[in-house]
């Protein structure tokens, strides 16, 4: 990564259940990756958010980094959580009634407004300021996005639709 990171702004996204061992690697990462300047901090609504973000802030500062006010977004609006749950079940190969703790416990993984982010991160104003700096440095527009439909890989003699139907029926039979 270090060989290809010139000109990039790197952000360390801690694991959801971040341990002291995870945080202990920050000084080493910061030394080897000059573009690493930030640690992502998100509200996960598990009851430990303030303590967890404070721990991330201390570890980031000790490594010469700063935290960013981020939002672990999985969908754009709370009412899209059921779709996220279905996608999680597909990824994990389980049914919705057996997914249990594989699913997020609430519908808070949606985009938050600037006002809501300011409220959530009022204890860490530097995190909000750093997030603004990173966002302002980004040169992105939705017009840069264009969907490129992938080439269909289907058996000889089949159409994409007939192959999908065959796979669907085979999966349903299992």
Please describe what each predicted stretch is:
Residues 1-174:
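Phosphodiester-processing cores and adjacent nucleic acid-binding clamps
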């Amino acid at each position: 990564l270090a060989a290809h990171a010139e000109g990039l702004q790197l952000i360390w996204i801690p694991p959801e259940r971040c341990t002291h061992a995870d945080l202990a690697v920050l000084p080493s990462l910061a030394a080897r990756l000059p573009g690493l300047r930030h640690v992502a901090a998100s509200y996960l609504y598990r009851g430990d958010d303030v303590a967890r973000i404070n721990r991330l802030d201390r570890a980031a500062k000790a490594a010469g980094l700063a935290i960013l006010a981020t939002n672990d977004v999985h969908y754009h609006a709370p009412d899209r959580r059921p779709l996220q749950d279905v996608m999680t079940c597909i990824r994990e190969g389980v049914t919705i009634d057996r997914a249990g703790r594989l699913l997020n416990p609430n519908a808070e993984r949606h985009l938050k407004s600037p006002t809501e982010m300011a409220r959530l991160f009022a204890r860490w104003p530097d995190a909000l300021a750093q997030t603004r700096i990173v966002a302002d440095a980004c040169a992105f527009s939705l017009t840069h996005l264009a969907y490129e439909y992938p080439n269909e890989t289907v058996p000889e003699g089949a159409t994409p639709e007939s192959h999908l139907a065959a796979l669907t029926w085979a999966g349903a039979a299992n």
